Regions:
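Class I SAM-dependent methyltransferase SAM-binding "motif I" and its flanking Rossmann-like core
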Residues: 1-64
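A contiguous loop/helix-start segment that scaffolds small-molecule binding in enzyme catalytic cores
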Residues: 63-161
Length: 161
């Protein structure tokens, strides 16, 4: 984007594309199997996207049946975005909705936590939530089974076992 806007040529830049695993998928795997069917990712960083747009996106997806991966939930300078996100989610989702938190995925300080939507706003001041954290918000079918988040695909009602 910057190269193009400055009149540069892509041929002048030597680069290599290395396929990877998105943070939401990596974090979802650490939590169990919460990201099946439809999933939406929303960043709470307002450095390049105005908070009004972020709120509008949250308002659009919160009442739907998506699981939601939230990136960049908290920074030292930007705390109110996380609180506003929690308010919007609580307007549209059950307070008992399972929440998975992964701090520092694949790093030495990796930490995971399962909680519920009602408790999530209280965790904003805790060390587990910062810019290296990904939060997975379950949908109306998500549940916790043996310390794992599970969003069923519906096989148990479709097939006779």
């Amino acid at each position: 984007e910057i190269l193009e806007s400055k009149g540069g040529s892509a041929e002048a830049v030597d680069f290599e594309v290395v396929p990877g695993v998105p943070a939401a998928q990596s974090c979802g795997a650490r939590l169990g199997a919460p990201l099946v069917n439809d999933t939406v990712s929303v960043s709470l960083s307002d450095h390049l996207t105005p908070m009004e747009e972020i709120e509008s996106r949250l308002e659009a997806v919160a009442p739907e049946g998506f699981t939601i991966a939230i990136y960049n939930p908290w920074s030292r300078k930007r705390r109110e975005n996380f609180q506003r996100c929690c308010e919007i989610l609580l307007e549209h989702r059950d307070p008992d909705t399972p929440i998975g938190i992964v701090h520092g995925a694949s790093r030495d300080d990796e930490e995971t936590m399962l909680t519920d939507l009602e408790t999530l706003p209280e965790l904003g001041e805790e060390d587990i939530i910062d810019m290296t954290t990904t939060i997975i918000v379950g949908n109306e079918d998500t549940y916790v089974f043996e310390d794992r988040m599970v969003t069923p695909r519906g096989y148990e009602t479709k097939y006779d076992y």
